[in-house]
Amino acid sequence: MARGPGQLSGPRPDTVTMPKRGKRLKFRAHDACSGRVTVADYANSDPAVVRSGRVKKAVANAVQQEVKSLCGLEASQVPAEEALSGVGEPSDILDSSDEMDAQEESTQERSVSRKKKSKRHKEDLDGAGGEEYPMDIWLLLASYIRPEDIVNFSLICKNAWTVTCTAAFWTRLYRRHYTLDASLPLRLRPESMEKLRCLRACVIRSLYHMYEPFAARISKNPAIPESTPSTLKNSKCLLFWCRKIVGNRQEPMWEFNFKFKKQSPRLKSKCMERLQPPIQYQDVHTNPDQDCCLLQVTTLNFIFIPIVMGMIFTLFTINVSTDMRHHRVRLVFQDSPVRGGQHLRSEQGVQVVLDPVHSVRLFDWWHPQYPFSLRA
């Protein structure tokens, strides 16, 4: 009996069906070690269909060992057949790939949990608000602050800084250190401290008369500084005067005074500008001599000095005089400031040479010997 064409004696061969568009192929590790060829083995395969990503290490090792065995090389010290039989089994490769997947997943989970924990910690820090105490508490605490600790106290918080701007704070500080036997100028006496204008500057000046730690600082200044002061560079000369000093010497000495105002550095942004006190305390913080200092040079004889008021002080040197017994001071003034790295020739600018020099002193605006106006 003849059979029809649809009934074959042998089994039908397996047919490979192409996947639909958009469905990803499963790339199994044992496929690389078998004789089956898939679309993923070709370089021009569709990336939308073929699974993207790197080849797992277990699959790469199996392929490498099979290639070595086909080329007649040994994958390791064991024969190629043993290597293929031991490593090429699908179950072992799947187990190793599963272990690597588990390790990768655990690593990702740890990194994600660490990021969440750091983010939660940052949110806790941002949301943590401290206690805000009233202004009276800070004013009470300020009564126990030493004069040298005022800056540290004002940096605690904004309310503490605001307290240091008030007239009550500076008045209490003055009364706490005032003594009846204190030798003070007329402007720094108690009857003159009732004025609010320049109150802060006057209290600071009085502390250098009454407060022992501050008075000890200025008493250690030598007649000739050990090193040339560098803080006066690019300062503007506001005033100049000289006076005759009659002392124990047979011949009088001459005192030359230069009043300078230090130039504030250029600020790149307005956020870096100096912190201004509240408007109601502007008079308390007013100081006409802010950033000013006085250079006082005493010579053994009179020396003619050119007009330097309004000019910029650029160079200051102190050397040994020609007689090897005194000092020689050289001052150089320019019409404009000297920027960093700019070198000037020796003949440029207006030069003032004082020789022989008896003493050189530099007084800041709070120094007791600094001449300040009684109207301040």
Swiss-Prot record:
Similarity remark: Belongs to the TMEM183 family.
Region of interest called Disordered, as start-end residue ranges on this chain: 1-21, 81-127
Name of the protein in its database record: Transmembrane protein 183
Organism: Rattus norvegicus
Transmembrane annotation, as ranges: 300-320
Main location: membrane
Membrane topology field: Single-pass membrane protein
Cellular component aspect of the GO annotation: membrane; SCF ubiquitin ligase complex
UniProt keywords, alphabetically: Membrane, Transmembrane, Transmembrane helix
Subcellular location: Membrane
SUPFAM superfamilies: F-box domain (SSF81383)
Keyword Transmembrane: yes
Chain intervals with Acidic residues compositional bias: 95-106
